[in-house]
Amino acid sequence: MLHFGGFIMEINHISKILEKEREEYIRNKVEEYLKQGFSKDDAVNKANQSWRTYIGHRIQDVIYNLLKKFLKDSGLKVTTDKALNNRNLPEELDKVKRLIAINYGEYLFLPDADVIVYKVENNDIKIIAIISVKNSFRERRFETTYWKLKLKESPVTSHIKVFLATPDKDNEISYKCPNGKPKKMRIILEYELDGIYFLKEDFEETEKAKHFGKIVEDIIEISKKL
């Protein structure tokens, strides 16, 4: 029997680590830009821009490593779109890449698949879920929903679950109707995707919007049905 308390504790602990890391990162970057001759305001702005780029990749790495660690005993495997974009892939990852590719006539493209979970049984690969990691929703707000709809078009990929994982620091999608005003983005994302997982405690939980600590159990349950 699997226990997920440790996973939830690690998620909550990592959120605190990332916040502390942000303070140190911004401070160091501001000092770096000041030495380069930028004004204080410009240095702060550039440091914040640099952090937004950095944190997106950092959160993806955190999620990948946590899922790899906690899904290992279930026999499930985890990879990333970054790994799939490498040349000379091993046979297994090459098959994974082909099984999530979307056909555009003579072209094939990978969806927004930051993290991919799959299983191998009797040399047969089955894609279980794709996890899109978003730190901010200022740009490409509905990119993940677009890929979900494209995956549903083909019988080869229609079974793949598409999840969104986010810390949503600015509360852009944390609540459906804050102050009685419907949040279009939250409502559409929740409706179209198979699940939204928050890397924080303060959000409106529903059947499809949960704490990220529950994603391992959900993925394992889905894998049993495939």
From Swiss-Prot:
GO molecular function, one term: DNA binding
Keyword Phosphoprotein: no
Catalytic activity reported: Endonucleolytic cleavage of DNA to give specific double-stranded fragments with terminal 5'-phosphates
Alphabetical keyword list: DNA-binding, Endonuclease, Hydrolase, Nuclease, Restriction system
This enzyme's EC code(s): 3.1.21.4
GO terms of biological process kind: DNA restriction-modification system
Family matches, as Pfam families: RE_BsaWI
Entry similarity comment: Belongs to the BsaWI type II restriction endonuclease family.
Primary role: A P subtype restriction enzyme that recognizes the double-stranded sequence 5'-CCGG-3'; the cleavage site is unknown.
Name under which the protein is recorded: Putative type II restriction enzyme MjaVIP
Organism: Methanocaldococcus jannaschii (strain ATCC 43067 / DSM 2661 / JAL-1 / JCM 10045 / NBRC 100440)
Gene giving rise to this polypeptide: mjaVIRP
